[in-house]
């Protein structure tokens, strides 16, 4: 409680002190007798010389941050993200997306998934013959070609300007390839290509990127442009460790896909003060009986005049995703799902000082509008009696998010304080159809809902650089997220299923940890880095769906196993309602995270370890209707990446060891009991998996890579894999080992 009060006071003070500081700095600048300019403290980092600079950058920051570059050892994005502490993915091979899980939570509003700083809102709907009654699988995710990803940043539990708006527990930002990643320094033109081929369902893929950059406008100015094109050919099936084809437990011929993507960027820099970037990213695919098209555009402007009071960034973005279903779905005919999102994020950072204390004040605003629309019954006659009001396919609605955020960073000697305060105002609108006359609900008639969520979100992070070997930090963050359209306007029974009183979630996260850096630990020139974090998160109003029935006199009653035989005798068999509501009991998540990096040049090792308890209520609609599945993390998991560099570090040979402790999956045969133990069941023991890899940097232009995944050909099921909860596996009609067996992958990259 004391920490909350301190954070609120500190957050309010951040704005006041920041504005006061600006006025003070202006007075200093206006003083003509003052001829000496004092710049903020410059801190030197050794990460630029490290071969894993993104990881090192994150390990040097106070707080629970992780980053990974493009060096993925030919692994999938699921493997790359699962190798980070406190980070996981929701695996669903039918989606074609990347779905990030942070500390056991996933989805729009819980984890802010971004591409180049632009929030993503795509809601995948994948027809699947393995689901209950042929219902499609649904999941929030990012449509992005892995060949375009140059870096991924993960933020867990602390605020980070606009990235933390409407993000309950953290964010994930995928950075795409840019002009500087294609054109060598000093050159005007550049070409970069990469190609990969893998067995056991991996298929083949390739990318070619062309870029040019030249001086323009002024001696410091430039203009550049790039175009990247990527394509994949992914098989419809793979084999597990027993040699059993996935067509027997989770895929069919419609899973064969050939996605293609394009990325364009134009950079205009008239001088050192102005920097403008225009970008367009496109994704197209056809698989699981649907066409997927995604179009994303953004404009970035950075203004940095010769003043420490002005460092302005503007981000304008617009995106849309379209899914059209080639074949009729169960009871719906053909359908279409559309979502679009427009956003603007403007912020300014000012730097000033008072005596020996440096201040950095950021003030910004983020506006975002997201809309979902659907159309069903396409191709059916006018006598088609089923309506769009009584099916859970692609809930529609419009959400507006308005926010103001601020952050004040105070540095004095070895001590640093980050004080943050933001305000979120959300409105979600949409049509609630009239309820069936046989059911008592409120409002009974048709109405346009407008559900509002608003509140202040303070945060505080304190850190100290006592010694390089011990740099402790402690933080508190209050975060909130508004309900999304898929929760408010879920409609398996039309208006009866919609909850006009749904509240947003609120989370209080406490973190304590430290960073450590030890150069020359064992031998001259080596380095050791460590980040350790302990966290505790308490979530109020946790949103999940439950099953309801229509009892006597049209009364809606919860199907939680408490109905008497007499009450069951009066239940109307025509209704089985799923409604999203708020948990009365707070949900608590806590755990430990550890990341370590040792590099001695010829030998290196990276370790990521997570231990957590992230148990939370599950949504019955996930098992029956295919909505977002449970996201409870394994109790422990660890990834060790270790290897050696040979021939002047041109050749690298290494191994990745993956350990996963007890994991759980949602039981598709739930009986409506509200106890989580009846909805989550233990997975079979997951063996330790070892991958081997090697690469050879022939010269600065050419490199070749090779890897063997699951080298021991172990038979197991990945944690948080959608297939694990399919009805055919639960009923014993298919094997439960859904992970791929031994797989060989080879790749090459050419850049000149």
Kindly give the residue locations of the regions a language model identified.
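Periplasmic-side early beta-strands and strand-to-turn transitions of outer-membrane beta-barrels
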Residues: 188, 192, 198-293, 662
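Acidic, small-polar-rich N-terminal luminal/periplasmic segments of exported/outer-membrane proteins
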Residues: 31-182
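Gram-negative outer-membrane beta-barrel transporters
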Residues: 411-417, 426, 527-538, 557-669, ...
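C-terminal beta-signal and adjacent terminal beta-strands/loops
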Residues: 123, 240, 480, 538-541, ...
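Membrane-embedded beta-barrel scaffold of Gram-negative outer-membrane proteins
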Residues: 313-327, 473-477, 504-582, 588-590
